[in-house]
Every structure is written in structure tokens, then in C-alpha cells.
Amino acid sequence: MVKIIFVFFIFLSSFSYANDDKLYRADSRPPDEIKQSGGLMPRGQSEYFDRGTQMNINLYDHARGTQTGFVRHDDGYVSTSISLRSAHLVGQTILSGHSTYYIYVIATAPNMFNVNDVLGAYSPHPDEQEVSALGGIPYSQIYGWYRVHFGVLDEQLHRNRGYRDRYYSNLDIAPAADGYGLAGFPPEHRAWREEPWIHHAPPGCGNAPRSSMSNTCDEKTQSLGVKFLDEYQSKVKRQIFSGYQSDIDTHNRIKDEL
């Protein structure tokens, strides 16, 4: 058994993992299904459309999951791993019942938070080294995928023809400071009275006074998350428009030269 595990890690080490602008996610769904869904969307999105349930934009709740260890039905985040190795290990743990699954390679973007950096000592599963995507991951953000069959990771990376480098080439994950206010600790959690979160506590969280009687800590965290997501989506749209405009300008310049 020890020999098998040793060989397994030698096999993994033959792949290149050091790529700071890429993240990874093990998923049982094939690429065609992911494409049809529009990308890797949070479970809370389908619940919202099916039942009208509001997505929970709370990083602490997301990181804890449910008491049974599964994803929350209203979860507003999608989990990713910082390396191919860790994504493969996650896949072998939670997708062991599938003969085939996929590891998606994903471009970074500022709707993503390093869970350990944001939650610090209160991160419930620090060994997972997770980066969570608020609102999900569009299909155009998926660089490609590896196929895993009976635990064996294919050496070939299948490139996604729908990937749009121009949208994401200059984007990085959000700095930890942008996520402190979205940490989502319970209202009386001691983190809200400690560094660095005390300076970012939403109204009603910890010692921060409520902005109104109707705004609770959870409600304010939710509204801040929605605002953050809207601003991110606007930024990507501006980048898309800028890319299109650049193509038009290049086309017109070539046309004039001819």
C-alpha cells in the first residue's frame, strides 16, 4: 500500500503545478454539460432560479459547508484549488465513486478569494488551501481540462475553445483586504473584534453599530457581497468592450493601410 501511494505522488510530481494565474477544480460533470450550464455555477444559483431562494454570499458559511460535509443548497461560491495536485487529491476523495471525472483549469479573476487569507485562524479547513469564486466561473474563464479515469490523470490538457484570454489575462484574485468585510462570521463572533476584521466589520457585526434597525450583520454582509459581485461583473464587461474596441481599431487601421 505504501508503495502504491509513493508511486501515485511520483506520478503527480511529473506535472507542472507552478502557475500563479491558474486555479483548478475537480468536477464529475463533463465539459459539454459545463458548457451548457454556462460554466461552473454555484449551487445557490440553481436554487435561486428553481425555488427563489436567495444565494448565501457568506464565505464563512461556504467554507464550513453543512454538518454532513456537503455543499450548502444556497451556496453562492464555487470552490477551486491552488494546484493540480490538490485538485486531484480532492477528486480522489469526493469523486471516488466516479470512474471518470475532470479537473478544470481556470483563469484567476477578482471575484475569487483565498479562504485562508480572508478567514485567517478561523478558516475551518486550512489544509484544503481553497480559493472560492463568488458567483461562479463562466465557461469563457475555463482554460481547459484534464480527464481523470479510474484515478489516473491524463497527461494531455484539453484546451477550451471557448476560453477568452482577453477577458482574464490581466486579472488576479482579490486581495485579502477586499474579502474581510465579506468573511461572514456570526454577529457575535470574536473575529469581528480582532485584527484585521475589526476594521472591516459591516454594521451590526461585532462592535460595529447597526446602520438601521432593519439591517442585521448577515443582511449587511449579503448586500456588500451583491455590490462586490456587481462591480466585478461591470469590470469584466468593460474589459470585454475594450477588447472588442481594440479589434475594431486594428481592423480599421489595416483597412486604411491597404
UniProtKB/Swiss-Prot annotation:
Active site per database record: E130
Enzyme class: transferase
Leader sequence residues: 1-18
Ligand binding (NAD(+)): R25, A26, D27, S28, M41, P42, R43
InterPro entries: Enterotoxin_A
Highest taxon above the source species: Bacteria
Cited SUPFAM superfamilies: ADP-ribosylation (SSF56399)
GO CC terms, sorted: catalytic complex; extracellular space; periplasmic space
Recorded domain comment: The four C-terminal residues of the A2 chain occupy the central pore of the holotoxin. Deletion of these residues weakens the interaction between the A subunit and the B pentamer without impairing the pentamer formation.
Function: The A1 chain catalyzes the ADP-ribosylation of Gs alpha, a GTP-binding regulatory protein, to activate the adenylate cyclase. This leads to an overproduction of cAMP and eventually to a hypersecretion of chloride and bicarbonate followed by water, resulting in the characteristic cholera stool. The A2 chain tethers A1 to the pentameric ring.
The protein's name in its UniProt record: Cholera enterotoxin subunit A
Source organism: Vibrio cholerae serotype O1 (strain ATCC 39315 / El Tor Inaba N16961)
